[in-house]
Structures are given as structure tokens and as C-alpha cells.
Amino acid sequence: MRYNAGSYDIVVIGAGHAGCEAGLAAARMGCKTLVCTLTLDSVAMMPCNPNIGGTAKGHLVREIDALGGEMGVNIDHTFIQSKMLNTSKGPAVHSLRAQADKKKYQERMKKVLETQENLHLRQLEVVSVEVEDGKVKGVLTKNGAFFECKAVIMTSGTYLQSRIIIGDVSYSQGPNGLSNANELSKSLIDLGIDLRRFKTGTPARVNKRSVDFSKMIEQPGDEEIIPFSFISGNIDRDQVSCWLTYTNEETHKVIQENIHRSPMYNGSIKGVGPRYCPSIEDKVMRFQDKDRHQIFIEPEGDDTEEMYVGGMSSSLPEDVQVQMIKTVPGLENAEIMRTAYAIEYDCIDPTQLKASLEFKNIDGFFSAGQINGSSGYEEAGAQGIVAGINAALKVQGKDPMILTRSDGYVGVLIDDLITKGTNEPYRMMTSRAEYRLLLRQDNADFRLTEIGHNVGLVTEERWNKFQERKQNLERELERLKELQITNKTENNEKIVELGSTELKKPIRMYELIKRPELDYFSLACLDPERPDLPKDIGDQINIIARYEGYIQTQLEQVAQFKKFEKKVLPEDLDYNDVNSLRIEAIQKLNKIRPLNIGQASRISGVSPADISVLLIFLEHYRKTGKNTDN
């Protein structure tokens, strides 16, 4: 029986990584927020890999943190190993990765939600989103409770009509043995939302006591622990190791002999899987020139013997999985605790969304996370905080926060999803960001904290710490650019000791730092008046000085990019009325409805010639009295 259960400003459907960030952002911005989850035991659950961050994903976590989100703070409290990846490469691709204690991560995040002012966390299954005259009115639960609200954020993850697949066994269930949501999809279809079917998977977990680590290569954490959050401060903690091993010819033989039993290859799986995280059977069949593949054995927490077998995601039958795992060095006697599985689920076509993550045709209805066709905890959290901020701004009658490709990886992620769409689970990579030297993980706060503060999410504590960090960097850069190092004998002796060449004439310290064999830290011997600053300030100075020319080039590219982004296209424009556009371009433009010329130029099927036509049209449109160039 239906009954009115109360009213909220915002209702969040789902409490995974997107839902947690969305709910916290909305509540912290002063909105009365309800966060619904199928079970309170799955808040911030990690159904797959037990880590946060990694290449490009670490950038997203830093950006979530810079905006005022919780993911970075939460992993800093609960990690069991920390590692900076890609340190042999340039700073644009340096990425922080932390091994999580999965249960502690969940428990702390749940506690944060439970104690957050303005936030009500409840175990409820939402079965429909109710809309009237194109505007959200509320949500209805399976128990008949109707919650009136001004905005809804859908963060339902991989739970919509999800199906677990292990060989020829298939059943209706959510990830990790949890129940799924089978009714919400129909509500979305009734609202005119296009759905598609995606697939992802997870590897087996084995008992630590049954693993022979002597046959594996130890992968310890970094001695210097670098936190994800800009407000965490120094962290000193004992760390655990991960372990590396490899598949071999015997492993591949087991897979090849049983490939006919794989639902990936016999047609049982209809959903599209992630290109950049293929199953082990997919890797073996697609890359037959490779005689081995990496397997990482990762602990799932301090208080469990479960070990994650990274790199062996599979949907092969259980008996084949047992054979396959026992061929891997160190896993000959491994006891499987959880069987690997594939999961199919409903998700939306993200081109139905605006850059604010609000549906174009439903006022007040937002969507974030894997339901939008992305993969990964970090991608979900990044979308979640943007949706939460924009839903709150919507309720408050304010303009949305739109992050562009030059603002951060979050902007790249959202722009890719809403402009190009995706035919497979979308994974963030550094190669997707054109301006990655500007969008480094070390400067996320310089790019985004002011934005987070302006929308009312960044706390005064965080803002004050950011201001101090910003001032320290600016003052030190200014000092170094003015500090002159003379070519006197004493100075030259020290410079030669550092492996560099003597000075022929005086030089500014800032220019001296640019020498590849020198850096800010080693030159302290020539700088007795140097202030005592945190190490991260010195790291920033090294990057800014050494890559100054490249950074300036990218800044010029961004200036050009912004010119097109400022050429706004009319919201109600019917592209059939624009003369000389090709039919394909008209169809794509009418579907995507880009905000501006920049976004239009990134739509697949819209050519440079079409963009020229649009620019001519806009010039005529402007001359008739409607200015679209901000």
C-alpha cells in the first residue's frame, strides 16, 4: 500500500562510491538528503579490486578531494599499502594507488554518512522515479513509501536487472552475493530513457594460507607515504605487500581447451565488456603471441585471509577455474574462497545527460557512476560529487557547476560520456586528457578547490590549508626567480659536487633548478635562507621549473580550446534549420545537443566542415541580436 513517507530536497538511489559522494556533497551544501541502498551492509562496497587510485584514477581521487569530497580522506584512513606509480615517467602520469582494507573502508564511509548533518541513510529499494510535466516529483519504494523530493540522483551501479554468469550457470543476483534491483529499469524505460546492457567481472579470491609466496615477486609499498587528500597531513603506518606471479603455457592450455565452455565465447553473455580490463580467457585468446600474463595477489584487508587474484577475471565454469588457478606458480595448492564471475547489468546511454549530469528531458533527475556506462570506483566517485553538487545547486536555484576538459580529469570523463557516449564500460586513462601536463595529480587543489569553495562544499579548514599551500608556493617561486647565485669558486665547487658544470656567470636559482642533474632539494646547499616548507612544495617547484616551456605551450592550447567553448549554441536550436550541414551531423547534433562549438567538434560524425557551417550560422545568429559568445 502506498503512503507518503516524507519529503526531501534530494534523494540518492544507491550508496556505492557515486552515491556516497553525491549524498555527502548535497548534504554538506545544506540540502536535506535521503540516501537509499538495497542493504546498509553494502555502503561503499568494493565488489572487485581492493584498491583506490592507479593510473589516471589517482588523478580522479585527488580531484574529488580538491572539490571537497570524501574518497581521498577515507582511503588515507584505511589503506594498507601506498604506492606512487609511473615515477620513471614524466609528472603528468604520476599516479597514486593505495591498497585498501575493504571492510574498514566501508565501515568508515558508512559512519561518515550516518553522522553527516542533513543526511538520512536508509535501507530501501526504489522501484520507480515519479515525474510530472517533465519534472521530478519523488521516488516510490518497494514497501510502498513515497518520498517527495526536488531532485533525484540515480547511482544504482551494476544492480539493475543484474545477472551473475559462471560458465553455463546463470542467475539473477547483484555483485558479491547481494540482491539486485529488478523493477527500477522498467520505470526508466517508461520515462523514455534508453538502456543498454553492459558486462563486467571479477576474479577469484583465494585463502592466504594456501598461497606459496616464495614463488612470487614481492611488491612492497613506498617508504615515503604520500596521502591522497590534501588535508591528511603526514601518515606513518606499517604496510603489507602485494605479490606478482605469471600465467604460463599450462594455464593457457587449460583455458584454450575449455574455451567452448566460456559464456564469453558461446554467446551466453550478451552485454559488452570492458576493453581495458579483459577477462583472462579473453587475454589468452586475443593475445596468443604472449606466453605469459601478469597476476597480482593482493590482500583484501588486515583481518581477513582473502587474497584478490588480480588479472584473472573470468566467467569460466568453476571446475575450470580451479584447474586454471592451480597452474600458476605459487597457487598450486590455492584454496578458492570466492569464485570468479561475470555480471551483466542495465545502464543508460550517457548522451542523454547534460554536462551537469542531469537528464536533458527530465528536470531534476541526475545520474552518476556505472549506471552511466563507466567502470571503476574512482570514475563513479568523480561523477557522484559532480551530480551531488549540481543537484544541490538546482535545488538552491543556482547555475550548475560545469567542469571542462581543461579543468580536470573529471571534466574529460564527463565530456567523453555525454558527447561521444560509450559502447563499453568507460575507463579513465591519462591518454584521454589532451592537457595532462596541466592536469597533474599534484596540482588538483590549485585547479579545483576554489571551485569547490565557491559552490559551498569546501570547508573553511580545507580552504585555509589550501590558501596556505598556495601562498607558500607563490612566495617561494617568486623568491627563487629573484635569488641570484654568483659564479664564485665556493658556489662552483658545490655545483660540480652535485654533478653539474661550473657557472660562467651569475644565474637565478629558478633557472639553475632547470638543469636536469639538479633540483630544488639538492640546491639547498646554495640557499641558506631557504624557508622550511613541506616537501610537496619542492616537488611542485621542480615540475613548474623543468617543464615551464611545455606548460606554457599547453596553456596556449587551452586558450584556443576555451575560445570554442565560449561559443555557446542555442539550447532550442533545431539543426535541421542550419543550411549546409550534412545529414549525419544534423542527426548527431540533434541527439547530443552540444552546449557549445567546442563540444560539437568532439562529436563523432561531425566534421570540421560542419563546424565551419556552425560558426557561420552563429555569426549570423549573433548579428540578429542574440549573443551566444560569452
Swiss-Prot record:
Localization of this protein:
Cytoplasm
Q: Which domain of life is it from?
A: Bacteria
Q: Which Gene3D superfamilies match?
A: FAD/NAD(P)-binding domain, GidA associated domain, C-terminal subdomain, tRNA uridine 5-carboxymethylaminomethyl modification enzyme MnmG/GidA
Keywords, alphabetical: Cytoplasm, FAD, Flavoprotein, NAD, tRNA processing
GO cellular component, as recorded: cytosol
Q: What is its main location?
A: cytoplasm
Extract the Pfam families matched here: GIDA (PF01134), GIDA_C_1st (PF21680), SAM_GIDA_C (PF13932)
Q: Which GO terms describe its biological process?
A: tRNA methylation; tRNA wobble uridine modification
The positions annotated for binding FAD are: G14, A15, G16, H17, A18, G19
Q: What's a single GO MF annotation on this record?
A: flavin adenine dinucleotide binding
**Which residues of this UniProt protein bind NAD(+)?**
273-287
> By its UniProt entry, which InterPro entries does this protein fall under?
FAD/NAD-bd_sf, GIDA_C_N, MnmG, MnmG-rel, MnmG-rel_CS, MnmG_C, MnmG_C_subdom, MnmG_C_subdom_sf
List cystine links: none
Q: Which cofactor does it need?
A: FAD
Q: How does it assemble?
A: Homodimer. Heterotetramer of two MnmE and two MnmG subunits.
Relate the protein's function as given in its record.
NAD-binding protein involved in the addition of a carboxymethylaminomethyl (cmnm) group at the wobble position (U34) of certain tRNAs, forming tRNA-cmnm(5)s(2)U34.
PANTHER family tied to this protein: GLUCOSE INHIBITED DIVISION PROTEIN A, PROTEIN MTO1 HOMOLOG, MITOCHONDRIAL
Concerning its family, UniProt says: Belongs to the MnmG family.
Q: Mind telling me what this protein is named?
A: tRNA uridine 5-carboxymethylaminomethyl modification enzyme MnmG
Source species, please?
A: Clostridium perfringens (strain SM101 / Type A)
